Regions:
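Helix-loop-helix junctions within the multi-pass membrane cores of secondary transporters/permeases
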Residues: 45-122
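Hydrophobic alpha-helical transmembrane segments in multi-pass integral membrane proteins
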Residues: 19-21, 146-164
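Structural signal for the N-terminal portions of transmembrane helices
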Residues: 40, 161-179
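Transmembrane alpha-helix boundary signature
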Residues: 16-31, 56-64
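Alpha-helical transmembrane segments and their helix-start/interface "positive-inside/aromatic belt" motifs
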Residues: 1-10, 175
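Intrinsically disordered, low-complexity non-transmembrane regions of multi-pass membrane transporters
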Residues: 68-76, 190-219
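Alpha-helical transmembrane segments
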Residues: 67-75, 123-137, 196
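Transmembrane helix-loop boundary segments of multi-pass membrane transporters
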Residues: 1, 20, 96-119, 132-137, ...
Length: 219
């Protein structure tokens, strides 16, 4: 009975979501991209950064993932740090996508160094950060990115380069959004390692200073 009710609610939610996508999100994203690109193409870079932050804040799956990570790690990795890392990563990815559309260069200039950096970081950070980073990449490139950011990027490309360049320059934004958390979340892990190392050095220094003071007092 509960499964049947769940299926019905899921179907109704899917119908409402797809209706909103086709009637609202996709047309608005496309028209907004065209209008802003024709007005001032360079403004879309900063706007892309802002949109990335808003997409992360509006994506329900991201909040679910952040909550699960905080619970499983018992607060070692907080929701706030995860949310900050994803906001920075996704915002930067969309902004860089706008730069690529404006200056018309290959996606490989982002993808190859990006995955090289993410794989290099995986050699140094704790495995939990690498696993969370890859899951975050899949979650961040969810419905909000596909139904609003991608049409927005297509609109920007049409406004800057023309319709002929859409297949060459507009697509790839979702790939960058999926790649960005691989770097930013693992950078959180690298930061945690550096922070722990500094704390250990400070603790050792306090112990040595206390031991030296005891020796001086004894003498």
């Amino acid at each position: 009975m509960r499964i049947g009710v769940g299926v019905i609610f899921t179907y109704i939610g899917l119908v409402i979501f797809l209706t909103g996508v086709n009637v609202g999100f996709m047309p608005i994203g496309y028209k907004l991209g065209v209008a802003l690109a024709e007005m001032n193409p360079y403004i879309v870079t900063g706007l892309g950064l802002l949109m990335g932050v808003l997409v992360v804040l509006a994506e329900p799956a991201i909040h679910v993932l952040n909550q699960q990570v905080e619970e499983i790690t018992q607060g070692y990795i907080t929701r706030r740090s995860m949310l900050a890392g994803l906001c920075i990563g996704v915002g930067a990815a969309i902004a860089l996508s706008m730069v690529r559309i404006i200056f018309d260069f290959s996606l490989a200039y982002y993808i190859i160094p990006g995955y090289f950096i993410s794989l290099a970081l995986s050699l140094f950070v704790p495995p939990v950060y690498t696993a969370i980073a890859f899951d975050s990449g899949g979650v961040a490139s969810g419905p909000m990115t596909s139904v609003f950011i991608l049409p927005f990027a297509i609109g920007v490309c049409v406004g800057v380069q023309g319709e002929a360049a859409v297949l060459r320059d507009a697509f790839g934004v979702v790939a960058l959004v999926a790649m960005a958390p691989l770097i930013t979340i693992q950078l959180l892990g690298f930061r945690a390692i550096v922070h722990n190392h500094i704390q250990e050095k400070r603790a050792m220094k306090r112990i040595l200073d206390a031991a030296d003071q005891q020796i001086i007092n004894f003498m």
